[in-house]
Every structure is written in structure tokens, then in C-alpha cells.
Regions:
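Transmembrane-helix signature of polytopic, membrane-embedded enzymes
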Residues: 94, 98-118, 135-136
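Membrane-interface alpha helices of multi-pass inner-membrane proteins
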Residues: 156-173, 179-181
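Perimembrane helix-loop-helix junctions
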Residues: 178-192
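Transmembrane-helix motifs of polytopic, lipid-linked glycan transferases
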Residues: 81-101
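Short hydrophobic/aromatic helix or loop-helix immediately within or flanking a transmembrane segment
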Residues: 35-41, 52-77
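Aromatic- and kink-enriched transmembrane "portal" helix at the membrane-lumen/periplasm boundary
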Residues: 76, 112-132, 144, 170
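Membrane-interface transmembrane helices that cradle and orient dolichyl/undecaprenyl
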Residues: 139-157
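Transmembrane signal-anchor helices characteristic of membrane glycosylation enzymes that use polyprenol
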Residues: 2-33
Length: 192
């Protein structure tokens, strides 16, 4: 149990070392990031999304950008720190799910480290994008599918699976495609 704590701390340190160049080097502000900041800024000024602001950002993403602008104004550092927090939650949860399913003979942090590397490769997953926020809830849905595959008769888990995919769709609309993934997983692996 003590070893698991050290592995978790080392996983967090590993991820922060991966993100340190971005946080310290002052990454340039890219057009999608600026667009998200402007959506939050306009919503903070009282404009309504889809009525006054014509953008393709999903409703919960717009709400998140509005809250960040409300508390921190147009700060790229706030967006990067929020992205790091969301990414850390994802990494730790993914590692937890993999370790509780005993995919490896011993508990280790290799799945979380690989997930951290993959998060750092893509721009959409290294900033506070709608895709990153939706991915959090898709990971929660993945955890529910794993539980459903173990305990085949639990209707509350099926509801939570759909709820998480629905919330992910409210952050990033193309995430609704994963509803098909959830249905197929339930159909093929549980016989439901």
C-alpha cells in the first residue's frame, strides 16, 4: 500500500515534468485557445452562447470558459493549469481502473505513464479543449463498462454509463459517437 502511494506520487511528478516546458516556456497562444478565451470573455460580458455568440463550442465547454474568464480573466496560465488538473485526474483515474482490473501481474504506474505521454503528444489534449474535458467523462464511462463486465446485473451502472457519455457530449458533441461503443460493449460482452 505504501508502494502504491509512491507510484502515484511518481506518476504525478512524471506528468508535471512532461508539462513543465509548456508551463515555464510560455507556449504561444494558438487560434483555438484564443477562440475559447473569447467565448468565455463574451459570455462574461453578458452575451448568450448560440444567440449572441456564433461559435461551435458545446454548452458545458462554454460554461467552463465563462467560469475561467469570470475568475481569472483572459489568462493563458489559468487555462494551462486547469488543463493540467483535468489531465492529472484522467491519468490517476485511468491508472486506478487498470490496476483494479489487474491487467498487469503487479500494480504499477506504466499505464498512467503511457497515458500521460499520449496526452502530451496531442495539442487538443494538452490544452483545456472541449475534447480534453469530454475525455474525462468518457474515462468515467470506461470505468463503468469495466464494472458492468464484472457484475453483469447492475442497472444503475448502465444508467451511469449513459449519463457520463451524455455529459461528455455536452462538452464535445462528437463524443456522442461513443454511445454506440457503450451499446456494443454491453451487447457483445454481457448479452444484455
Amino acid at each position: 500500500r505504501v508502494n502504491a502511494r509512491y507510484q502515484t506520487v511518481s506518476l504525478v511528478i512524471f506528468f508535471l515534468l512532461l508539462r513543465l516546458p509548456v508551463l515555464m516556456g510560455g507556449a504561444p497562444l494558438l487560434i483555438p485557445e484564443l477562440s475559447w478565451m473569447l467565448v468565455g470573455e463574451q459570455m462574461d460580458r453578458g452575451f448568450m452562447l448560440y444567440r449572441d455568440i456564433w461559435d461551435n463550442v458545446s454548452p458545458l465547454s462554454g460554461l467552463t470558459y465563462w467560469l475561467i474568464d469570470y475568475f481569472f480573466e483572459r489568462s493563458q496560465l489559468a487555462y494551462q493549469v486547469a488543463a493540467c488538473i483535468v489531465s492529472l485526474i484522467q491519468i490517476l483515474y485511468f491508472n486506478y481502473v487498470i490496476n483494479t482490473r489487474e491487467v498487469f501481474p503487479q500494480r504499477n504506474y506504466v499505464p498512467g505513464a503511457l497515458y500521460a505521454i499520449f496526452l502530451s503528444i496531442s495539442f487538443d489534449l494538452s490544452t483545456l479543449s472541449p475534447m480534453l474535458m469530454a475525455n474525462t467523462f468518457l474515462l468515467f464511462a470506461f470505468g463503468k463498462i469495466v464494472k458492468i463486465l464484472v457484475r453483469k446485473e447492475d442497472p444503475t451502472q448502465v444508467f451511469e454509463l449513459g449519463l457520463y457519455i451524455g455529459i461528455a457530449s455536452l462538452f464535445y458533441l462528437p463524443a456522442s459517437v461513443f454511445m454506440v461503443w457503450g451499446c456494443c460493449a454491453l451487447l457483445f460482452y454481457t448479452g444484455a
